């Protein structure tokens, strides 16, 4: 099939015809979170005829195949232009257009005795976005101290092993490796990737990143004392215990942070990367089910990042995955017979030094 592209200068100018013989490459990076996505367009400016874009110009990029049609990848606001030579060329760099405006303005705000869902609703409302929060978490107190909504929500999401992003007019806070959404905000099902779909792949494990559990401290409002909270990993009892060096305001908050740190450690114990012919349906945070590579590698993998590369030589999609539940079970080794820890973790007394 023949790869094709479309670049539109919003609101309604199609630049594709004038760029057909000048396009050197399109590179689009898609990562989990609010600040990682990026567009790079390299153009042949051999005669100096390519005009510099206006400040704040927005481009809509679509990729696809002549035989099956185009797929919209996203809208980007150009915030960097680079010219070089010889040979003379121009590179345009941009970020998702949804990230512009008030969401980058610094603010001061505080929340008490609420939920993460309510915080997301407040932030979405003042940025004229629709809130979607799939993380259930109680909030004792949160302080936004001269931070942008973008930075603040990214920080809070990480504490709950979640990601925050804006797509299709929606402010999304979703569990890591959980429910991916398309550019229009629709939930995406697990995508099956067979060995014959893949051009090349690489799998690696790292037991040094395994954790036997995570401990932290919390304040007990009833006793006024500090307690040490441990969230163990029954599948890795011999691995070292990690520590979150911040005293939480409650056992629930401490348990949530410890669980988030434990899940992050689990994802880093195995990685899978692969490249395949260009596909627009592969996006960060989507879960792929890989089949036909080999036992121990096959299974469900949450996508950490995707790079779409389009040039005169073709269109290629590069994918990086972190360990999902399937890989954690396979790499954990022999079980110890311990039951899964429920609730917010074990309270250890007296609190030790962290």
Q: Which stretches of residues belong to each language-model region?
A:
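Extracytoplasmic/secreted envelope proteins and their assembly/folding machinery
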Residues: 75, 117-120, 150-154, 213-214, ...
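Assembly/oligomerization scaffold segments
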Residues: 1-99
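Conserved "cap/hinge" positions at secondary-structure junctions
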Residues: 63-65, 175, 286, 292
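An acidic/polar, Gly/Ser/Thr-rich interaction patch typically located in mid-to-C-terminal regions
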Residues: 22, 26-54, 197-354
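Short beta-strand-centered interaction patches in the first periplasmic/extracellular domains
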Residues: 6, 89, 95-99, 133-198
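Short, compositionally biased
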Residues: 75-84, 109, 177-180, 301-313
């Amino acid at each position: 099939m023949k790869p094709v592209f479309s670049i539109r200068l919003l609101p309604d100018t199609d630049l594709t015809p004038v760029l057909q013989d000048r396009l050197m490459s399109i590179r689009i990076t898609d990562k989990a979170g609010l600040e990682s996505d990026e567009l790079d367009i390299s153009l042949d400016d051999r005669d100096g005829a390519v005009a510099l874009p206006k400040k704040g110009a927005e481009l809509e990029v679509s990729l696809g195949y002549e035989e099956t049609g185009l797929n919209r990848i996203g809208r980007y606001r150009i915030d960097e232009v680079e010219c070089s030579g010889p040979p003379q060329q121009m590179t345009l760099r941009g970020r998702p257009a949804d990230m512009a405006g008030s969401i980058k303005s610094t603010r001061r705000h505080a929340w008490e005795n609420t939920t993460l869902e309510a915080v997301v609703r407040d932030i979405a409302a003042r940025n004229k976005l629709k809130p979607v929060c799939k993380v259930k978490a109680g909030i004792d107190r949160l302080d936004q101290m001269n931070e942008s909504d973008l930075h603040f929500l990214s920080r809070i999401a990480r504490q709950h092993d979640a990601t925050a992003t804006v797509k299709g007019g929606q402010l999304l806070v979703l569990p890591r490796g959980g429910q991916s959404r398309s550019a229009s905000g629709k939930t995406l099902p697990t995508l099956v990737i067979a060995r014959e779909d893949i051009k090349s792949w690489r799998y690696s494990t790292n037991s040094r990143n395994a954790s036997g559990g995570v401990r932290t401290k919390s304040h007990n409002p009833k006793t006024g004392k500090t307690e040490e909270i441990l969230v163990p990993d029954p599948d890795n009892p011999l691995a070292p215990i990690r520590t979150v060096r911040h005293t939480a305001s409650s056992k629930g908050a401490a348990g949530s942070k410890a669980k988030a740190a434990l899940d992050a450690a689990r994802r880093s114990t195995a990685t899978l990367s692969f490249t395949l012919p260009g596909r627009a349906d592969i996006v960060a945070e989507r879960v792929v089910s890989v089949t036909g590579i080999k036992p121990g590698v096959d299974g469900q993998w949450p996508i950490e990042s995707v790079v779409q590369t389009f040039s005169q030589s073709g269109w290629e999609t590069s994918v990086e995955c972190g360990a999902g539940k399937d890989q954690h079970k396979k790499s954990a080794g022999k079980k110890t017979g311990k039951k899964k820890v429920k609730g917010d973790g074990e309270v250890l007394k007296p609190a030790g030094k962290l």
